């Protein structure tokens, strides 16, 4: 692999690749391919793949959301909220070979740009598998919201823009 990895828009043909990465990276927190397909259908502007020399190395899924409670893990949402009040970073996953390359920070920058462009003043997320340490380095702080479907070790977080 000689080129640098780049974030590009996700297409419906990329859903299985995103789901396979989720299976590899997230363990118990993985989601069905239908979840990624739905988020892409509902808000394609917020879905991206990290690719280098034709190999998919990661994905980013973001979308508008309303209210303090995040979308439930591995559940379809049906539609974007009519009156969203925040931008939700649903998932950022990188294969091990893409970690430490700056790709995750670039994904956060992309999410911040998308949120600001859409007029939101904050991004929320649910950190799992100890990822709260990474998210704090990206300017997120703990939020006092229970993300029930994500388990007791999950951490709800927010970044004010």
Model-predicted regions and their roles:
Residues 4-18:
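A short beta-loop-alpha structural element at the N-terminal edge
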Residues 5, 55-59, 87:
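Glycine-rich phosphate/pyrophosphate-binding loop shared by adenosine-nucleotide-utilizing enzymes
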Residues 15, 19-33:
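Helix-loop element at the rim of GNAT/NAT acetyltransferase active sites that forms part
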Residues 60-92, 99, 147-154:
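Conserved acyl-donor/pantetheine-binding loop and adjacent beta-alpha core of acyl/acetyltransferases
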Residues 94, 100-113:
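Conserved acetyl-CoA-binding loop-helix of GNAT-fold acetyltransferases
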Residues 105, 117, 128-153:
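Conserved active-site alpha-helix within GNAT-family acetyltransferase domains
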């Amino acid at each position: 692999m000689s080129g640098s990895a780049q974030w590009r828009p996700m297409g419906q043909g990329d859903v299985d690749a995103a789901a396979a990465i989720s299976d590899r990276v997230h363990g118990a927190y993985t989601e069905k391919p239908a979840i990624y397909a739905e988020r892409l259908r509902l808000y394609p502007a917020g879905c991206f793949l990290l690719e280098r020399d034709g190999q998919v190395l990661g994905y980013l899924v973001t979308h508008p959301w309303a209210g303090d409670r995040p979308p439930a893990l591995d559940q379809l949402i049906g539609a974007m909220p009519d009156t969203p009040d925040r931008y939700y970073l649903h998932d950022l996953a990188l294969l091990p070979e893409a970690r430490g390359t700056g790709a995750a920070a670039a994904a956060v920058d992309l999410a911040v740009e998308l949120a600001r462009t859409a007029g939101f003043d904050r991004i929320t997320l649910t950190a799992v598998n100890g990822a709260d340490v990474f998210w704090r380095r990206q300017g997120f702080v703990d939020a006092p919201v229970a993300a029930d479907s994500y388990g007791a070790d999950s951490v709800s977080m927010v970044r004010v823009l």
